């Protein structure tokens, strides 16, 4: 599952101008609890997202959409160095749960 998240970041999000210098070590862990995928990124990943011009909302929903379609889950939660961050200086509330948004996926 961790490998799948890494592939998503390198393939899908690379087209969005995702910051260089991130490695697979920036995905600290991925697990499923009940109907939720839990993704734990490094603090370095949080800093890279803050520093980039990346559309955080699109990133969150691209990852959510791919994970919900790939695994038998309904929700995704993101953590950075084990913590649920409210924001990364953007308009996304990272501390909450993300559900599949079929409108964004079209």
Show the residue positions of the predicted features.
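Bimodal "functional hotspot" detector
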Residues: 1-106
């Amino acid at each position: 599952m961790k490998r799948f998240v890494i592939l998503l970041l390198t393939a899908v999000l690379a087209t969005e101008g995702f910051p260089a210098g991130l490695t697979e070590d920036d995905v600290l862990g991925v697990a499923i609890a009940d109907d939720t995928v839990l993704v734990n990124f490094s603090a370095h990943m949080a800093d890279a997202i803050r520093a980039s011009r990346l559309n955080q909302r699109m990133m969150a929903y691209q990852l959510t959409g791919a994970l919900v379609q790939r695994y038998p889950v309904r929700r995704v939660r993101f953590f950075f160095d084990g913590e649920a961050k409210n924001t990364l200086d953007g308009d996304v509330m990272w501390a909450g749960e993300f559900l599949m948004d079929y409108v964004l996926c079209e």
